[in-house]
A protein has these predicted regions:
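N-terminal glycine-/serine-/threonine-rich phosphate-binding loop
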Residues: 1-35
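Short beta-strand segments
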Residues: 36-40, 68, 105-106, 133-136, ...
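A glycine- and small-aliphatic-rich helix-loop capping segment at beta-alpha/alpha-beta transitions
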Residues: 48-60, 83-85, 147-156, 217
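Glycine-rich N-terminal segment of FAD-binding domains in flavoprotein oxidoreductases
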Residues: 29-55
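Ligand-binding beta-strand-loop-alpha-helix segment within the catalytic cores
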Residues: 1-3, 59-132
Length: 246
């Protein structure tokens, strides 16, 4: 049964502050918590706010652990478009989190299934994800879990759809440079998080957002599985919320 808390905001800065409030509550309650993190432009105001709050003495990341949702296959950690580099430049390098307490899937792993199993074990050893940050793709994908005929459970390799590659080509010089595959947490891993915070902006996401939370639960819209999560907070702007209940 869906337990959805909707917070509507007007600006990216408001979204960052609202999302940071959710993370701050978890970190203050559990200083060694596990954050599930995401990349892209939407989380940037959140990451800026988290950095500012630690600098102001409101937060302490020294015991916090983090596990990222996904990584491109074939990109080295220092590649300009790797998600590891994104996290370093936009969050990790600016807070007190320990390097050994941050994990991102290894896009260069020789044995990807083995790496994926080790990734799951690490999250399990940490006690699971306490708060998971998510966005949503135009086709309803979460992480890189693309529409398909089943809900993938564990961390795994996935072939990226043309729609996803097209959406991400703005970060690369051309579509030919966009990787064709990625490693992503599975739907089961995401659903095991104790709390989920989804951040969404833009009128172009209004239709899929309504499908995710109020349409049929189907692997053809991977995010629709969130209807079965016990604690989801959706933070979105008015444009994205256009089709959500008032």
């Amino acid at each position: 049964m869906l337990h959805l808390n909707i917070i509507k905001v007007k600006t990216p800065e408001e979204m960052g502050k609202a999302a940071a409030d959710e993370f701050e509550a978890v970190i203050c309650r559990k200083p060694a918590c596990v954050m599930g993190l995401a990349t892209g432009s939407t989380p940037l105001p959140l990451y800026r706010e988290l950095i500012a709050r630690e600098q102001a003495g409101k937060l302490d990341f020294s015991r916090v652990r983090s596990a990222n949702l996904d990584e491109y296959k074939g990109l080295a950690p220092d590649h300009p478009q790797s998600y590891r580099r994104f996290m370093q430049e936009n969050l990790f390098d600016h807070i007190s989190i320990k390097p050994e307490n941050t994990i991102v899937p290894d896009g260069l792993a020789d044995d990807i299934p083995s790496m994926c199993r080790a990734y799951e074990r690490k999250i399990e050893d940490w006690g699971g994800v306490d708060i998971q940050l998510l966005g949503i793709g135009h086709d309803g994908h979460i992480g890189f879990n693309e529409p398909c005929d089943h809900f993938p459970v564990m961390t795994h390799e996935v072939k990226l759809t043309d729609m996803t590659r097209e959406a991400n080509k703005r970060f690369f010089t051309s579509i030919n440079e966009v990787p064709t595959a990625a490693i992503t947490m599975g739907i089961g891993t995401v659903m095991a998080a104790k709390k989920i915070v989804m951040i969404i902006t833009g009128a172009d996401k209004a239709e899929i957002l309504h499908k995710v939370f109020f349409g049929p639960v189907t692997p053809e819209v991977p995010g629709s599985i969130l209807q079965f999560h016990h604690d989801v907070t959706l933070i979105c702007d008015e444009a994205a919320a256009a089709r959500m209940p008032q």
